[in-house]
């Protein structure tokens, strides 16, 4: 639990300015949604459509935007005013969430540890985990039950691998990385050479996967090893569940990709991109920095202009695609008008036929 004054002081370490309105001595024991928050709980408003809940919520503390007028609610709630209430609430959540128990402290008796493995301080390795030969694991890292590291895997400090994560040989993972259950890092890329008889032979995939610092990888996401060189996930990248990153791709720093998106081989995404769910990228293309791609778009060519938004299939800049979609909605009316004109034209031609026959 924290008093409102303590919350104010904590958030002031990360946000400037922070303004407290109300009773700083009241105790807060949990965060909650504004729709259901009760006395003793803290919530936030970052979206105007939730402002109506200020009159209804029972929350003791509400974090709001600095420009919001809250005078009519003072007395019922206390307020913390910040420039970014959403981010402030996220920082506060980090203080309230209890630590997860992912694996027991230490190395489980059933874990299999290969030869020439370097293990840092305060490392936990769960039941039936398998660590191959010549692996390196940094300090404070947790490898949960049934996870597998093949040979020559390097993992940094403060990394968390949830149960059933698989890292193929040679994978390199930075610091403070979180990988959720079912993820497979470093499986062979989809490379097959067609033969004259119509068959295929497998192209050896002898590269690796490199993952930077502060990356989070969702459940059942797969990142394939490079054919040659590296598939690279740069620092700060966030991948949702069920994302496929093919061989030799590069995902730029702090790019986020939502579920069921797929990036084909040798494609590069820039820094700070936002990719919606079920987006598909063709292979061997490049997308610049700060690009947003709407859900279900199909990106079939390179876009090198930074900061644009893409939409549709094939994807094109948002303004062009919206114009096209607006025109597409009129096709039904245009079709009906065209049919009517055809009928009129037939009628006119029919009335002229007897005259033509007398010539």
Curated annotation (Swiss-Prot):
InterPro entries, sorted: Hexapep (IPR001451), Hexapep_transf_CS (IPR018357), LpxD (IPR007691), Trimer_LpxA-like_sf (IPR011004), UDP_GlcNAc_AcTrfase_non-rep (IPR020573)
Pathway: Bacterial outer membrane biogenesis; LPS lipid A biosynthesis
Enzyme active site: 247 (proton acceptor)
A biological process term (GO) from this entry: lipid A biosynthetic process
Known EC number: 2.3.1.191
Gene Ontology cellular-component annotations: membrane
A GO MF label: N-acyltransferase activity
Catalytic reactions of this protein: a UDP-3-O-[(3R)-3-hydroxyacyl]-alpha-D-glucosamine + a (3R)-hydroxyacyl-[ACP] = a UDP-2-N,3-O-bis[(3R)-3-hydroxyacyl]-alpha-D-glucosamine + holo-[ACP] + H(+)
PROSITE patterns: HEXAPEP_TRANSFERASES
Highest rank taxon of the organism: Bacteria
Alphabetically ordered keywords of this record: Acyltransferase, Lipid A biosynthesis, Lipid biosynthesis, Lipid metabolism, Repeat, Transferase
Family, similarity comment: Belongs to the transferase hexapeptide repeat family. LpxD subfamily.
Biological role: Catalyzes the N-acylation of UDP-3-O-acylglucosamine using 3-hydroxyacyl-ACP as the acyl donor. Is involved in the biosynthesis of lipid A, a phosphorylated glycolipid that anchors the lipopolysaccharide to the outer membrane of the cell.
HAMAP family reported for this sequence: LpxD
Oligomer and partners: Homotrimer.
Protein name: UDP-3-O-acylglucosamine N-acyltransferase
